[in-house]
Amino acid sequence: MEKLVIAGREFDSRLFLGTGKFNSNEVMEQAILASGTEMVTVAMKRIDMDDKEDDMLKHIIHPNIQLLPNTSGVRDAEEAVFAAQMAREAFGTNWLKLEIHPDPRYLLPDSIETLKATEQLVKLGFIVLPYCQADPVLCKRLEEAGAATVMPLGAPIGTNKGLQTKEFLQIIIEQAGIPVVVDAGIGAPSHAAEAMELGASAVLVNTAIAVAGNPVEMALAFKAATEAGRRAYEAGLGLQADNFIAEASSPLTAFLE
């Protein structure tokens, strides 16, 4: 498979993982390693910034994994910039998953504040990966603002409903000049494969793995599905017929004559 490149860094894995909702840090770490991921995002609000030996960080930081702090919980661009600067100081990284969702019930991203924050953070030297609505116009504006990727949602966070925004994702992928990472709503390995078959650069999964009966096995399933979907995309999927008339793969016409 082709390597994924974000801000000049190469990734072999196209499966990114979130770290919420696991029943223990040990299970979380096992799932991370089983998935083969090289990008793990963690909410700053879950980390004790004053404790360099925070137990959770011990289970996340590995040599081949890019830590991606996120700003989940902030309500506007001003709070996002403040949180980003704290993250850079605490973790020593310019990488940032930008999340601004002021409504705590649906956790839908605020498009206006997300674009505003992206513009400011890029100027401050951050590598910005914004979580956003599956809005083709917005995604293009974020790209023009200097975002390293766009991360449009497939469905609301934690719903496991799959690619409810599929048609919009197709447009976003088609017109993007930067990687497109489908984030939120991916609830089954088949959803991840579908996103990759569309041409998404990567997928970010959290809830579906964390709340599974066996998170480690589910991480392995998502790893396989993500790879399969990407391989299918690179191989070139056959066109779907626009009707239900069958076409034999091995015609017998000449044989019967």
Swiss-Prot record:
The keyword Transferase applies. Keywords: Cytoplasm, Schiff base, Thiamine biosynthesis, Transferase. GO terms for molecular function: thiazole synthase activity. It is found in: Cytoplasm. Its main location: cytoplasm. The active site is at residue 97. It comes from the Bacteria. One of its GO terms (biological process) is thiamine biosynthetic process. It is an enzyme of class 2 (transferase). Its EC number is 2.8.1.10. InterPro entries: Aldolase_TIM, Thiazole_synthase_ThiG, ThiG. Pathway: Cofactor biosynthesis; thiamine diphosphate biosynthesis. The keyword Methyltransferase does not apply. Catalyzes the rearrangement of 1-deoxy-D-xylulose 5-phosphate (DXP) to produce the thiazole phosphate moiety of thiamine. Sulfur is provided by the thiocarboxylate moiety of the carrier protein ThiS. In vitro, sulfur can be provided by H(2)S. Belongs to the ThiG family. This is Thiazole synthase. It comes from Bacteroides thetaiotaomicron (strain ATCC 29148 / DSM 2079 / JCM 5827 / CCUG 10774 / NCTC 10582 / VPI-5482 / E50). The gene is thiG.
